[in-house]
Each structure stands twice: as C-alpha cells, then as structure tokens.
C-alpha cells in the first residue's frame, strides 16, 4: 500500500484525498505536507519559499496601489475624508501630501502618483515571485550562498534578523527625512486649526522619549499613545531608527550567546511564531493609537476620537445656550453638578454632564480655551472662534461609535445609519487581526516547542479511522 505520509515526519500531516494533486519535490511524500498546507511544503526549499514571499509582497503592494487609486477616483474634495470611508488617503494626507491649512485637500495628484508607483512596484514583485516560484532554483544555498540558509544555522538566522532591523531603521528615518527636509508633515496643532509644516526642533532627550514607555497606560497617562506633539513623534523615530540600525549591525557582526542558544527554539516554525507574536503586539498597539491619538492620526482626516466627539457635543451646546443667555459658569444640571462646567477630581474646570469621564481629552480646537486651572470661563465667554464652533459641531455628529443609543453623552443614532468612522474600521480591524496573529503565535510556538522536545500532538496515522474507510472517489 502506498504510504500517504513521509516516513521522516516531524509535523502532524493530513492525507490527500487525491494523490494526483502533486508537484515534483513539493508533494506530500517528499515534504510531509498536503497541497493545502501551502508554504509549509517549502520549508526546506529556500528558492521556492523566496518566490512565495516575493509574490505575497506583490499581492500586498498591488492591493495598496489599487485601493489607493480607487479612493482617489471616488474622492470628493468638498467632504471630509472620514465621511467617505477612506483608509489610505488619510495616511498620505497625514504625511503632508496634497493638503493645506485646516487639512483641506488642495491637490489629489500626489495620491494618484502614490497609487501608480505601488501598482508598478507590484508588477515587479509579481514577476519576481512567479520567477522564483516556477523557474528559479529550488534552493539558494548552492548557487547563491549569501541568500541561502539552513533554519538551524543560528549565526545565519541572526544575520538575517540584523538585515531586517536595518531595513526597519531606514524606514523610520524615511519619515524623519520627510518631516525635516521634504515638505514636512501635517500638524493638527498648528495655530488656527492645523497645517503642513517642517519639523525644526526635534525632541531627542532620552528622558522625554523613553519617559513615554514608562508611563502608566491608564487615564491621563496613556503610555506611548499619549504623545501629542510632532517633535516627540519625529524625535522618537530618530531614536527608533538609530536603535534598529545599530541593533541590526550588532546582530550581523555577532553570534548568539550561549544563553540565547539555549533559550530559543531554532527552527522555521519557531521563527514564524516569534514573528506572529511581534505582529500581534504591533496590531494591539496600532489599535490603541488610532482609537485614542489625534496627533499621529489627525481628526481632520480620520474623524474625531470617541472622547473628542463627546467633548465636542458638550462644547457645542455650551456655545448654543450661552448665546441664548445661559450663565454657563453657574447653571446646575439635574444631578446638582454643573450643567456645562464642573470640577475634575484634581480641581480643573471641565465640561459637565456625561462627558465628564473624558475630562482629560486634549484636542487642538479646545486647548486655546484652557487656562492654568482647566477651562477658562473668561475665554469661554469671549474668545471662542468660529472655526472652533464649526469643528466641534462637525465632530459631535461624526463620533466613531456605532451604537443606537447614547455613548458618553453622544447621540449616535444618526451615525449608525450611513457613517462608519475610519477610526472604528482601523481600530477594530487591527485588534481582530492582532488577536488572530496572537493565536497563531501560540499555535506555532506550541508545535515548534513540541517538535524541538521530540514529541508532537497529533493523530497516530497508523490507526487513523479514515484509512479503513472507502476512498471518496
């Protein structure tokens, strides 16, 4: 009887229902993996695995280019980006392309160029992927030893890690150069409601940059997500880029120490699990950043944050009722607390009502009205500018919430009908993807550790019930 699994099997495998679905060198008998296990068949075929990864990169870049052009084609300059379901153009606008004062889009040509460049890049990657998957050498070790590798070769693995770190560092510096020399980036805090500007006075103080990492993640602290000026963000990228490049050089030049050799599992599946774990962390951090941070993700493009929409509603009604003659400093609400203004636990003057829970919100349209002790009553009575009223009314009606009832005091039933904030999309998608990647991390880590320890969980193939059943065909 033909065995449907490799005798030298290191992984639990599934049986093929149809033995003809095989490619030479990539069939189940040679690799221990069925056709549907995808890249697992290529674990020891470095050339073919390269093809799979390059083709995958091509698909990713093709999506980016095609979606970019789709958004440009559908873009209406008269409406805010966040009303149009856009998720790519806000990123380009944040980088300072095509926008002017107040986040107004003045030129869509840079967006078009971005889309076309990504499409062209995807064609190059697609060709490379097909070439290496079908025509190139199956393994790179013999012909191109620099690009070849064996998973157990610890020194080679850390060299590859080092190269990746250097590339990440260069990526961080690309943002720095854009902000410093190539037109600047969009600063939502620029006076009068935001503008594109070059960053001139970088924050490089390690106590400031690494102070963010030491902050509590709760309340007014907010860990790294609390960053609210571009000097700190760009300065942080200088530090990150430098650390990545220096760490990359270190990993290329050194071999793993004995404790590292003992601590880690050195196999392809182990590296996959480490990567998935890192991506899960990225996903969770990105989720928090896009949900709470309105500096790295300006509200002009992504819509207001939840707290921002709630505070904007309180501000809008304060403005309205003050015009109608209300004394906003002393009016009481139904609970006996201040209707429009009250004090926070630490004594600052804050907005009253249900939005009190968001009292530590910082937003460019609100900060000019604060004094040393919170909101300044004199400024609220005399200094409110038309652009602040317009922006808060706009944000009040575009909360990133899909609830049919009030959330944080914001009436959301209108929004649930025909508006989903890009913040909701980006935060939810990154949380869900981060969670799936984390589960994948646990799964592959468990398998890699089991294989390294010399045992695996799986069905004993010799007594598998399906072997005694009539074949499907």
From Swiss-Prot:
Q: Which UniProt keywords apply?
A: Acetylation, Chlorophyll, Chloroplast, Chromophore, Manganese, Membrane, Metal-binding, Phosphoprotein, Photosynthesis, Photosystem II, Plastid, Thylakoid, Transmembrane, Transmembrane helix
Q: Which residues carry this modification: N-acetylthreonine?
A: 15
Where does the sequence pass through the membrane? 69-93, 134-155, 178-200, 255-275, 291-312, 447-471
Membrane topology listed for this record? Multi-pass membrane protein
Kindly indicate whether the keyword Protein biosynthesis belongs to this entry: no
The UniProt entry, under InterPro entries, shows: PS_antenna-like, PS_II_antenna-like_sf, PSII_PsbC, PSII_PsbC_sf
Task: Output one GO BP term.
Answer: photosynthetic electron transport in photosystem II
Naming one, the record's GO cellular component terms include:
chloroplast thylakoid membrane
Which stretches are tagged as propeptide in the UniProt entry?
1-14
Q: Which GO terms describe its molecular function?
A: chlorophyll binding; electron transporter, transferring electrons within the cyclic electron transport pathway of photosynthesis activity; metal ion binding
Kindly list the positions at which Phosphothreonine occurs in this protein.
15
Q: What does this protein do?
A: One of the components of the core complex of photosystem II (PSII). It binds chlorophyll and helps catalyze the primary light-induced photochemical processes of PSII. PSII is a light-driven water:plastoquinone oxidoreductase, using light energy to abstract electrons from H(2)O, generating O(2) and a proton gradient subsequently used for ATP formation.
Give the quaternary structure. Answer: PSII is composed of 1 copy each of membrane proteins PsbA, PsbB, PsbC, PsbD, PsbE, PsbF, PsbH, PsbI, PsbJ, PsbK, PsbL, PsbM, PsbT, PsbX, PsbY, PsbZ, Psb30/Ycf12, at least 3 peripheral proteins of the oxygen-evolving complex and a large number of cofactors. It forms dimeric complexes.
Q: Which HAMAP family does this one have?
A: PSII_PsbC_CP43 (MF_01496)
> What's this protein's name?
Photosystem II CP43 reaction center protein
According to its UniProt entry, this protein's organism is Piper cenocladum (Ant piper)
Q: Which gene encodes it?
A: psbC
